[in-house]
Design a protein with these regions (language model features):
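Structured interface patches
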Residues: 1-153
């Protein structure tokens, strides 16, 4: 998104719209399938030779669940976007797309789960436990922590 400085009045200017999800430039990421449109509500104002932009950003993202490995949709919201850009006299425009992209990526959850009730996958056979139980025989071995019960501290 490019902000044309000549079009910003002294009191500032309001921008609302969306950019295609392609601005996120996500390629070959095993955890993220795709981003939807990046929607923005921004306010830009020139202050002392700078362009100050603040507002909010939202995007839908298709992500892989960290527990069951299925893709699901979640919303990434940035409610406190704030950046100041140098805008000396003679500058025609300021490009802010890279900062919008960066802010959305910083708000993508690192350990995303499709739901709080997700049971994940069986660690032995990899079966999706949300779809049913697996046929693995769980070995009931000795409790490895029971040794600590015998410590006298």
């Amino acid at each position: 998104m490019k902000i044309l400085l000549a079009r910003i009045p002294e009191e500032g200017s309001h921008y609302e719209g969306s950019d295609p999800g392609a601005i996120m430039q996500i390629e070959a990421d095993p955890q993220i399938e795709e981003f939807g449109e990046v929607e923005y509500v921004l306010y830009a104002q020139r202050v002392s030779g700078e362009l100050v932009v603040r507002g909010s950003l939202t995007s839908e993202v298709q992500m892989r669940c960290a527990r069951c490995s299925e893709f699901f949709s979640t919303t990434v919201t940035v409610s406190d976007f704030l950046r100041a850009y140098p805008a000396p006299e003679g500058t025609d425009s300021v490009e802010i797309t890279e900062d919008l992209r960066e802010e959305i990526l910083l708000h993508v959850p690192g350990f995303a789960v499709c739901s709080a009730e997700c049971r994940g996958m069986c660690p032995s056979c990899g079966a999706d436990l949300n779809k049913g139980s697996c046929k693995c025989r769980r070995s009931e071995g000795p409790d490895t922590w029971s040794v600590l019960d015998g410590l006298n501290l």
